[in-house]
Amino acid sequence: MELAMLLAKLPEAYSVFNPLVDVLPVIPVFFLLLAFVWQAAVGFR
């Protein structure tokens, strides 16, 4: 029974990470831009 209570409290515990979860999908776009900037820096060899 205490396991069910623990699982019920988990969403409240993870509500702190909501801003982080909102940012996570943007990270691959940053990697794409980083690759483009890197290639521009080396002259698209």
UniProtKB/Swiss-Prot annotation:
Residues 1-8 form a propeptide. It is a single-pass membrane protein. GO terms for biological process: photosynthesis. Its main location: membrane. It is found in: Cellular thylakoid membrane. The keyword Transmembrane applies. One of its GO terms (cellular component) is photosystem II reaction center. It comes from the Bacteria. The keyword Membrane applies. Keywords: Membrane, Photosynthesis, Photosystem II, Reaction center, Thylakoid, Transmembrane, Transmembrane helix. The chain crosses the membrane at residues 24-44. One of the components of the core complex of photosystem II (PSII). PSII is a light-driven water:plastoquinone oxidoreductase that uses light energy to abstract electrons from H(2)O, generating O(2) and a proton gradient subsequently used for ATP formation. It consists of a core antenna complex that captures photons, and an electron transfer chain that converts photonic excitation into a charge separation. PSII is composed of 1 copy each of membrane proteins PsbA, PsbB, PsbC, PsbD, PsbE, PsbF, PsbH, PsbI, PsbJ, PsbK, PsbL, PsbM, PsbT, PsbX, PsbY, PsbZ, Psb30/Ycf12, peripheral proteins PsbO, CyanoQ (PsbQ), PsbU, PsbV and a large number of cofactors. It forms dimeric complexes. Belongs to the PsbK family. This is Photosystem II reaction center protein K. It comes from Trichodesmium erythraeum (strain IMS101). The gene is psbK.
